[in-house]
Curated annotation (Swiss-Prot):
GO terms for biological process: translation. Part of the 30S ribosomal subunit. Forms a bridge to the 50S subunit in the 70S ribosome, contacting the 23S rRNA. Gene3D superfamilies: 6.10.250.3130, S15/NS1, RNA-binding. It comes from Agrobacterium fabrum (strain C58 / ATCC 33970). InterPro entries: Ribosomal_uS15, Ribosomal_uS15_bac-type, uS15_NS1_RNA-bd_sf. Belongs to the universal ribosomal protein uS15 family. GO terms for molecular function: rRNA binding; structural constituent of ribosome. SUPFAM superfamilies: S15/NS1 RNA-binding domain. This is Small ribosomal subunit protein uS15.
C-alpha cells in the first residue's frame, strides 16, 4: 500500500523545482497522488476496509489543500502539475 523508496525518489527528481527539493508543493502532491492511486487499487479487492478508507480521505484532503495553495500562489505551475498528473480539477 505504501510506495517504495525508489519510486518516491523518482517522483522527487521528476517534479523537483531545484536540486534537493523535497518540500515543494509539486513534489508533495505527486507523492500524495501516488499513494492515493495505490490505495484506490487496494479498495478494488478490499471493499470493506473502512479504516484505510479514512486514511485515503485524509490524503485526498491534504492534496486538495496543497493544490489550493499552489493555485493561489502560482496558477501556471498549478495547471502544469494537474496536467502532468492527470488530476481532474
Amino acid at each position: 500500500m505504501s510506495i517504495t523508496a525508489e519510486r518516491k525518489a523518482a517522483l522527487i527528481t521528476e517534479y523537483a523545482t531545484k536540486a534537493g527539493d523535497t518540500g515543494s508543493p509539486e513534489v508533495q502532491v505527486a507523492i500524495l497522488t501516488e499513494r492515493i492511486n495505490n490505495l484506490t487499487g487496494h479498495f478494488k479487492d478490499h471493499k470493506k476496509d473502512n479504516h484505510s478508507r479514512r486514511g485515503l480521505l485524509t490524503l485526498v484532503s491534504s492534496r486538495r489543500s496543497l493544490l489550493d495553495y499552489l493555485k493561489k500562489k502560482d496558477e501556471a505551475r498549478y495547471t502544469k502539475l494537474i496536467g502532468a498528473l492527470g488530476i481532474r480539477r
